[in-house]
């Protein structure tokens, strides 16, 4: 079915796209199909995808093994409630998750999206302390962080970036430490942890957990910080009052930074781990929140007798089957060479741009490449130019960045980096 001019007019008038004004909507480009690393426009042009559909489609599009997993599961059942029922797809997926994550993380809660995974992690932390008889209700997090758009997740996002002022009185008043300043490739400076440690000491009796994005702060600014900061956070949290550490790896999990999980850069094991995005290879919405048996049993032995959360589509068999197939692909370990090759090429083709005074900073880690401008970019104008060049890149704020599928070829990646370089000029 082709998209007509009438369809686009309907879309513009009636369909509310993410972060888009209904009175002044940004242009939308109709995609009719996708395969490998290319998106097929309705007018026949193809675009090399540099976004992995917001960082999720790590294996590319229309992957035969993921298609097969979805098709086979669809013939059995697309959905069944998860309350009082289980099924092979969920069991196999959770077994893989337990095997590939740190040994301490033994209990898996499946949910609908990354935002919900964060909601689940925050509820776990609050219920954990209630079960222990302590009234700890605040979360300590970092400036420039992003954890999702639902109310609980928003409450631990950067107050300025997430416009907390719009929802004053509704969002919980949490604690925000100064974001780490020491970059990944710089020499570690111990004073970088001081604002975090001071804030935690000041509010030690109130804090239930610390939540952060390990090493890479994603939608809050694509900031790549020193792994030692994460290690020192873990040390401060453990030594001080044994608070729970929540790692939001929704954007970084499953190889994006060059490690399977970004926490591995600092050899840190969190108490709660949030996963999403690439979990299904970008096919369907699904997330997972993993925690230790200690946390799970403490919650279960509390007054409620259980963890108080249960989405309608929890453990959806179709999503679980595709996620299981996606993780099976990762387990074959081709991603390591793929991400390493992407990182090498991004450094070769993007880092020289950092010599220009117009760009405060160009940074690369794993399959992430970021060019930061001095002023906010014109998203609509840049997007139009990118499409004309046959690439799909979605800038935001001051940033033009790439997070391509792992299967991208060198020539395709060069088309993306060349487009970024030209746009930045």
Swiss-Prot record:
Family annotation (PROSITE patterns): AA_TRANSFER_CLASS_3 (PS00600)
Positions bearing N6-(pyridoxal phosphate)lysine: 277
Organism: Serratia marcescens
Oligomeric and partner information: Homodimer.
GO molecular function terms listed in the Swiss-Prot or TrEMBL record: adenosylmethionine-8-amino-7-oxononanoate transaminase activity; pyridoxal phosphate binding
One protein family per Pfam: Aminotran_3
Name the record gives this protein: Adenosylmethionine-8-amino-7-oxononanoate aminotransferase
Region forming the signal peptide: none
Binding residues annotated for pyridoxal 5'-phosphate, in chain numbering: 114-115, 248, 311-312
Annotated positions binding substrate: 54, 146, 277, 310, 394
Functional description taken from the UniProt entry: Catalyzes the transfer of the alpha-amino group from S-adenosyl-L-methionine (SAM) to 7-keto-8-aminopelargonic acid (KAPA) to form 7,8-diaminopelargonic acid (DAPA). It is the only aminotransferase known to utilize SAM as an amino donor.
Top EC group: transferase
Recorded name of the encoding gene: bioA
Family designation: Belongs to the class-III pyridoxal-phosphate-dependent aminotransferase family. BioA subfamily.
Record keywords: Aminotransferase, Biotin biosynthesis, Cytoplasm, Pyridoxal phosphate, S-adenosyl-L-methionine, Transferase
Record site: Participates in the substrate recognition with KAPA and in a stacking interaction with the adenine ring of SAM: 19
EC number: 2.6.1.62
Major location (coarse): cytoplasm
GO cellular component: cytoplasm
Pathway participation: Cofactor biosynthesis; biotin biosynthesis; 7,8-diaminononanoate from 8-amino-7-oxononanoate (SAM route): step 1/1
Reaction catalysis annotation: (8S)-8-amino-7-oxononanoate + S-adenosyl-L-methionine = S-adenosyl-4-methylsulfanyl-2-oxobutanoate + (7R,8S)-7,8-diammoniononanoate
CC cofactor: pyridoxal 5'-phosphate
GO biological process per UniProt: biotin biosynthetic process
């Amino acid at each position: 079915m082709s998209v007509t001019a009438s369809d686009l007019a309907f879309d513009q008038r009636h369909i509310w796209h993410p972060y888009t004004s209904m009175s002044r909507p940004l242009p939308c480009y109709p995609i009719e199909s996708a395969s490998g690393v290319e998106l097929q426009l309705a007018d026949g042009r193809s675009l090399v995808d540099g976004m992995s559909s917001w960082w999720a489609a790590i294996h590319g599009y229309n992957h035969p093994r993921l298609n097969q997993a979805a098709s086979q599961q669809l013939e059995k059942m697309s959905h069944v409630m998860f309350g009082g029922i289980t099924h092979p797809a969920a069991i196999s997926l959770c077994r893989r998750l337990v095997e590939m994550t740190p040994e301490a993380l033994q209990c898996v809660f499946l949910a609908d999206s990354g935002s919900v995974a964060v909601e689940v992690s925050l509820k776990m932390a609050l219920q954990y302390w209630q079960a222990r008889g302590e009234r700890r209700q605040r979360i300590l997090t970092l400036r420039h962080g992003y954890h999702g758009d639902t109310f609980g997740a928003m409450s631990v996002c950067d107050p300025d970036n997430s416009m907390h002022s719009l929802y004053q009185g509704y969002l919980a008043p949490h604690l925000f430490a100064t974001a780490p300043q020491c970059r990944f490739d710089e020499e570690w400076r111990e004073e970088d942890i001081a604002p975090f440690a001071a804030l935690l000491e000041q509010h030690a009796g109130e804090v239930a957990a610390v939540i952060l994005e390990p090493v890479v702060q994603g939608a809050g600014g694509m900031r790549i910080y020193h792994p030692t900061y994460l290690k020192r956070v873990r040390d401060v949290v453990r030594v001080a009052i044994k608070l729970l550490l929540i790692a939001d790896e929704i954007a970084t999990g499953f190889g994006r930074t060059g490690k399977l999980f970004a926490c591995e850069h600092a050899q840190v094991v969190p108490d709660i781990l949030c996963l999403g995005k690439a979990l299904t290879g970008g096919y369907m919405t699904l997330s997972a929140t993993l925690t230790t048996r200690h946390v799970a049993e403490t919650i279960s032995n509390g007054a409620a007798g259980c963890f108080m959360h249960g989405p309608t589509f929890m453990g959806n068999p179709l999503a679980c089957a595709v996620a299981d197939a996606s993780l099976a692909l990762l387990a074959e370990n081709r991603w390591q060479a793929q991400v390493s090759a992407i990182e090498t090429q991004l450094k070769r083709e993007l880092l020289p741009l950092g010599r220009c005074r117009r760009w405060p900073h160009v940074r690369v880690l794993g399959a992430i490449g970021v060019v930061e401008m001095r002023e906010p970019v014109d998203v609509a104008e840049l997007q139009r130019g990118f499409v004309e060049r046959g690439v799909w890149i979605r800038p935001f704020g001051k940033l033009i960045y790439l997070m391509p599928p792992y299967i991208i070829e060198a020539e395709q990646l060069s088309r993306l980096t060349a487009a970024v370089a030209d746009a930045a000029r």
